[in-house]
Amino acid sequence: MSIKEWFEDKRKITALLKNSVERDSKDANETEKNKNKSIDYAKIKKLWAQCDNCENLLYLRFLRENQSVCKECGYYLQMNSSDRIELLIDRDTWRPMDEDMYTLDVLQFYSENEPSHSDNLNSEDESYKDHITFYQIETGLTDAIQTGIGQLNGLTIALGVMDFQFMGGSMGSVVGEKITRLIERATAESLPLIMVCASGGARMQEGSFSLMQMAKIASALYIHQKEKKLLYISILTSPTTGGVTASFGMLGDIIIAEPKAYIAFAGKRVIEQTLGQKVIEDFQVTEHLFGHGLFDLIVPRNLLKGVLSELFWFYVLRSSL
């Protein structure tokens, strides 16, 4: 190799190394930019929410003050269980029950096709236990319901509030057991009972253990309502579907629904495929169902506590006669 060829090869190698360094630097910058975007998005998510109906951005602080109702279009956004409890229960009177109850993966359920929910769960090999852990971290709850005893305008009640943010409010063995224990305590202490429903139905990862909860809860309610003659009020919020609708959701002595809530057993597409015909739009919305006698009341959120208070005091007065 001549000196000229040696210098030419050295120049080419230097150029290649320079391009490689520049490319690595560019990739690092892109990664940093994406990281910053992710951080910014996380910050935005903690401060703002988007209306599902009109798509306006809503400042979370003002949204909570307005009970998660969009000021622009009046659409009812989903409320988490803690906000619901704050809405209904008098300050400093809430006593939670069974907070130490955790779900076990009895069936060792495993699905390669389930989508990931976060960067922490980016594997195709996510187990049911992984999903439970993710939602526990994300929501601060142990499962998809909070139960407890509290006072509503001075009257002691038993309250269960489902949380759709935890695996779509699906009902598994823990949710069913917590509801059953709440009903049994309300029965033992002669307390009126409220259940706030928000659920996609039975939790498929628990199979028959999940479906069994429907019968177990219904049996506990039978004793509470029929044998002990105690009041049970069911509040249906959007969405309430599947096994929850087919069990305790529709077993209330009084059934209350929020305006424009989606309430169903099976979805529109499933019904159309089963019947082989089209169904009308919005036939599973509160107002349409109310017109066909499925509910007793449609109550806006800002009036709910007052309406419940009147119903309970009327019940107490009637019971004392």
UniProtKB/Swiss-Prot annotation:
The organism of origin for this protein: Pinus thunbergii
An annotated GO BP: fatty acid biosynthetic process
Gene3D superfamilies: 2-enoyl-CoA Hydratase, Chain A, domain 1 (3.90.226.10)
Protein known as: Acetyl-coenzyme A carboxylase carboxyl transferase subunit beta, chloroplastic
Compartment annotation: Plastid, Chloroplast stroma
Pathway(s) this gene product operates in, as recorded in its UniProt entry: Lipid metabolism; malonyl-CoA biosynthesis; malonyl-CoA from acetyl-CoA: step 1/1
Subunit structure: Acetyl-CoA carboxylase is a heterohexamer composed of biotin carboxyl carrier protein, biotin carboxylase and 2 subunits each of ACCase subunit alpha and ACCase plastid-coded subunit beta (accD).
Catalytic reaction list: N(6)-carboxybiotinyl-L-lysyl-[protein] + acetyl-CoA = N(6)-biotinyl-L-lysyl-[protein] + malonyl-CoA
Stretches annotated zinc finger (C4-type): 51-73
Enzymatic class: transferase
E.C. numbers: 2.1.3.15
Binding site for Zn(2+): 51, 54, 70, 73
Co-factor requirement: Zn(2+)
PROSITE patterns reported in the protein's UniProt record: COA_CT_NTER (PS50980)
Family per record: Belongs to the AccD/PCCB family.
Pfam families assigned to the protein according to its UniProt record, in alphabetical order: Carboxyl_trans
